[in-house]
Amino acid sequence: QWSSSAASDVYKRQYRNNVYFLGMGYDILRLQATKCKLLVDGEVMEGTGYFQKVSVQAPSFPWFWGMLHFDDGSYLDWFMPHVTPMWSARDDEPWRLRDFFRSPNIGTGVFHDRKTGNTQNFNNCTVELSKQNSPDALKDEKGKPLPEFLVKVWNEESSANIRVRAVSRARWVFDQPTRASWVSHLTYNEYPLEVISINYEDSEGSRNESDYEWIHGNAEHAWGVLH
């Protein structure tokens, strides 16, 4: 069910064609934020949703991605594909010894501020990944520590520093036969997030998690390479 704000351009469907070289890249069609209703065991629940459809015409390399929705209708996302020794991983086991280095390929993000109506497009993004180590640290169903993400996105006018942790883990494993009996592998992880802190600064001031009633989000982390 659409909210009244869906008429604004920032809440309409957005399409982008991203070509890197030799015609290779990806297409993405998405709705950044919309109000939704869900029926679960006869109970009606309300929330916000993000929808996307992606078509890829290139090898799929490791990436980080995340999206946060705010109670006032604002949203923030980040995306950082990267080069890492984890491209050679052949299974879904996290926290490998080889997972010690990540060089960003590109980094982008966007923050739409519902209060001011301004949208900031970020051309820089860094993501640091660590194991949860607090007394209430969470683990997945295999007993592996869930990750904590430290994210920074910025441009010349504004910046956001975000600290979030995963509360559970869903994953999909892809094994693609290729040439000479070689099998390429990709593990795609998805994590519902708990926001620990967020600090956003621009020319109009600063905001943090205490300025919002709630912030909910989701993150992706993929490793391996699918070709």
What are these language model-derived features?
Residues S4-H227:
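Structured soluble/peripheral alpha/beta segments that form catalytic or ligand/cofactor-binding pockets
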